[in-house]
Amino acid sequence: MTRAFYIGRFQPYHFGHHTIIKQIAEEVDELVVGIGSAQKSHESTDPFTAGERVLMVYNALENLPIRHYVLPIEDIKYNSIWVHHVASRTPHFEVVYSNNPLVIQLFREAGVCVKQSPLYIRERYSGTEIRRRMIAGEKWEHLVPKSVVEVIKEIDGVTRLRNVSASDNNSSL
């Protein structure tokens, strides 16, 4: 049995992530999805809480044909021990899927097999672009699974994003 790890901020979870996860699911038996930067929320680049993102991902993966876990992973100050931090918060996994150069470097240094995940129309399916559309009042719903739209509407996430993006003096209290 092979269990994989895939991490993202998922601000918000979109069809780019969804396509990658479906491809990973064809190669492994189980998948651990890490909600990265779990401590961040209510910021223009990170508007959603870890709990909201867990719900987005969990609901979107409801029909994934393999067992999967969705777990929050907080950032830490020391990159050199980050892999151990992740390992202490997740079930054991044999392979990591990532395109993030730092994530790749840290897991390779720790002796973990790393596979690069294919990017899926990144210029269209990116959290940055989706958040930009939300702020601008443009259509964004077609870029994310329906279940993600439902979570964002339930929490009035677009209004939150617009409010926290209105000032550059809101990064911390």
Swiss-Prot record:
Pathway as given in its UniProt record: Cofactor biosynthesis; NAD(+) biosynthesis; NAD(+) from nicotinamide D-ribonucleotide: step 1/1
CDD domains given in the database record: NMNAT_Archaea
InterPro entries for the chain: Cyt_trans-like, NMN_Atrans_arc, Rossmann-like_a/b/a_fold
Keywords: ATP-binding, Cytoplasm, NAD, Nucleotide-binding, Nucleotidyltransferase, Pyridine nucleotide biosynthesis, Transferase
Subcellular location per the Swiss-Prot or TrEMBL entry: Cytoplasm
A Pfam family annotated for this UniProt entry: CTP_transf_like
A GO BP entry: NAD biosynthetic process
EC class name: transferase
Known EC number: 2.7.7.1
GO molecular function list: ATP binding; nicotinamide-nucleotide adenylyltransferase activity
GO CC annotation, single: cytoplasm
Reactions the enzyme catalyzes: beta-nicotinamide D-ribonucleotide + ATP + H(+) = diphosphate + NAD(+)
SUPFAM superfamilies from the UniProt entry: Nucleotidylyl transferase
Family: Belongs to the archaeal NMN adenylyltransferase family.
NCBIfam families membership: arch_NMN_Atrans, cyt_tran_rel, PRK01153.1
HAMAP family for this protein: NMN_adenylyltr
Descriptive protein name: Nicotinamide-nucleotide adenylyltransferase
Protein's organism: Methanosarcina barkeri (strain Fusaro / DSM 804)
